[in-house]
Amino acid sequence: MPKWLLARPGPLAHCDDMRLTVVELDPAMTATARRWFALQDDPRLTVRHEDARAFLNRQKEQYDLVFVDVFNSHYAVPFQMGTREAAAALRRAVAPGGVLLMNVISAVEGEDGRLFQSIYNALRSAFAHVRVYCVGGTARPRDVGNLMLAAFAEEPDGAAEAAWEKSASPALLALLRTRYRGRLDFATLPLTDDFAPVERYALMLLRQ
């Protein structure tokens, strides 16, 4: 992701005043990215090797975009990143007018959607507006797939969005068309730091 954002013709290639901070727990992953995936040094890029939640808990700076892509296994989000308290910490990290993107592998509805539903409800408790995009091509709400949650610090301006979409690239427009338009009212409780059975929810998915 950092390489794509910063390298030509990436979206930030010509934005010299942009700054990108990556929080990665394992230094070996960064070394692998440099050795095998052509991640280059860039004065706009800062890499922090620490737990993402620990970083958030002490972070004072705010960001226009926060992207969360963390997994313990094929499906399980580390519990400390999917709770109501984590959502509040993420909200504090998002600047006014900014957005959080979070990658989750799950169904939307049914037993296989419990992980997504709990994280969705946690984000709804902290952000003004949350949308869901079925970016993995999920055909039906009960199918397991790649979901992208977009949580907005403020209610989106519909007129501004419509104007912005007129100049969006075809690839981005295709992504926006994957927005889930079904029911997003779930009884599943948000996870908390004291009760976060993410492994149990993930085991439901592993039986697929």
Annotate each PLM feature.
Residues 131-208:
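Soluble small-group transferase modules, centered on the S-adenosyl donor enzyme superfamily
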